[in-house]
Amino acid sequence: MMERQQIKQIFGIVCVVEDLKEATENWRTMVEFDSGSVRTGKSAENVKHIYRGKEIMCRYKYMDFDMGGVRVRLIEPENKSGGDPYSDALSKRGPGFHHLMVYPENREELIERYDEEGIKPSLIEESGEDVYLIYDFEQDTGLCVALHDEITGPCARV
């Protein structure tokens, strides 16, 4: 019998926003964060996205910053009409929290356990050898989680 797997660390929080520039200014007003940690960009073109079993285009702009040792990422989807996880979240709930970036004790065992229980990722992102899986537990827990095999961002420096 497989041992119960635990999330070892939450190292990132992803929020979806309508307007990245406006949301950035709101965050700058609300909280103090290291302005030297700010990184902006666009989703990579070479990433394959499989959302709810279907390959999709998922383009977005983002801003990352370090807040108390945790990476916060604000995402503005380019497509606002639905069909990808970020625009669907905006349509359903409006701007706000989307998912946690987590580092489990044993990612492969946890994925295997989810698979045995019939739990499939809602989003698979493949970029070269990197594969990120986002599981949608919103109905049960109110959140989605992205399982990572390493810690990135400010937590990786600790």
Give the positions of each predicted feature.
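N-terminal beta-strand motif that seeds the catalytic metal site of vicinal oxygen chelate
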Residues: 1-24, 31-33, 95-102, 158
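Vicinal oxygen chelate
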Residues: 1-6, 10-18, 62-71, 73-76, 87-106, 136, ...
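Short consensus segments that form the blades of beta-propeller domains
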Residues: 3-4, 53, 90-91
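Conserved short beta-strand elements that form part of the metal-binding/catalytic scaffold
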Residues: 34-88, 131-154
